[in-house]
Amino acid sequence: MIFSILEHILTHISFSVVSIVLIIYFLTLLVNLDEIIGFFNSSDKGIIITFFGITGLLLTRWIFSGHFPLSNLYESLIFLSWAFSIIHMVSYFNKKQQNHLNAITAPSAIFIQGFATSGLLNKMPQSAILVPALQSQWLMMHVSMMILGYGALLCGSLLSIALLVITFRKVGPTFWKKNIKKNVLLNELFSFDVLYYINERNSILLQQNINFSFSRNYYRYQLIQQLDYWSFRIISLGFIFLTVGILSGAVWANETWGSYWNWDPKETWAFITWTIFAIYLHIKTNRNVRGINSAIVASIGFLLIWICYFGVNLLGIGLHSYGSFTSN
């Protein structure tokens, strides 16, 4: 009873704090509040509080159930939210790049934890005895590596999607185009002295507009480079986690079912996801290929991760069906 109450309190604390963090962060985007009362630092500290809250929640379920809390979809979602909070803390200690990652980790954490605690998962929030297939020492190794891999790959893929949005956004002032048309009309209406004054004024405005354009494009270029840099680093880390998770799962499957690979739906989609991100890393090693191509591949990988993670849970079939929406 005590563990259940403690778990309930920690769940609501972590969800409430991450909700406040998200509101604060979007307020700092709309209004420069961080210079007034330091709201942005408060949001970073809020994520740290969320991290310890989710950690306490996982430890409570571990002690209460007697097994590592990764036996169903609810627990895996909480663990995934915990993984996003870890990524956020890494960005917190790296002050130069924290803003870009915060825009990804905070909304992701609140969305995942909100879905996990929304009541859509039937009886999954209640701890239960492990099914025989999960009673193995490989549970912690395999599932934790897969979830950490999902978290890192999702974060890196979202950065790639942001890169694509910024890249394909139409940028470039049309001031000089309008200015040319205006000068043609003025030449027909005014004398030389008046035109000289107007042209001088327009030249100053045009130069200011060009300087602003160069400044904006330079910032845009720097932002694209940073997004590409961090996307590659985080996806590389997630790819390592995913590889270790798949290999440990193969060893576990051989011990349980006598075969390393059974082409289960979850296994098949995990292999497809692994292949897509292997292609992404291969593209990144080729300097002749533009970064936008790798970002497109990472965006495809983002969709595949959700298919792999939720696809089997929606269908409720295969060797991994014990974590489905319909299981009790």
From Swiss-Prot:
InterPro entries membership: Cyt_c_assembly, Cyt_c_biogenesis_CcsA, Cyt_c_biogenesis_CcsA/CcmC
A matching Pfam family: Cytochrom_C_asm
GO molecular function (one): heme binding
Topological category with respect to the lipid bilayer: Multi-pass membrane protein
This protein's UniProt keywords: Chloroplast, Cytochrome c-type biogenesis, Membrane, Plastid, Thylakoid, Transmembrane, Transmembrane helix
TM region positions: 13-33, 46-66, 73-93, 101-121, 146-166, 234-254, 263-283, 295-315
Keyword Mitochondrion carried by entry: no
GO biological process: cytochrome complex assembly
Keyword Transmembrane: yes
Cysteines joined through disulfide linkages: none
Chief location category: plastid
GO cellular component terms listed in the entry, alphabetical order: chloroplast thylakoid membrane; plasma membrane
Compartment(s): Plastid, Chloroplast thylakoid membrane
Domain of life, source organism: Eukaryota
Subunit and interaction comment: May interact with Ccs1.
Family: Belongs to the CcmF/CycK/Ccl1/NrfE/CcsA family.
Listed NCBIfam families: cytochr_II_ccsB
Functional description taken from the UniProt entry: Required during biogenesis of c-type cytochromes (cytochrome c6 and cytochrome f) at the step of heme attachment.
Name recorded for this polypeptide: Cytochrome c biogenesis protein CcsA
Organism whose genome encodes this protein: Olimarabidopsis pumila (Dwarf rocket)
Upper taxonomic lineage: Eukaryota, Viridiplantae, Streptophyta, Embryophyta, Tracheophyta
Name of the gene this protein is made from: ccsA
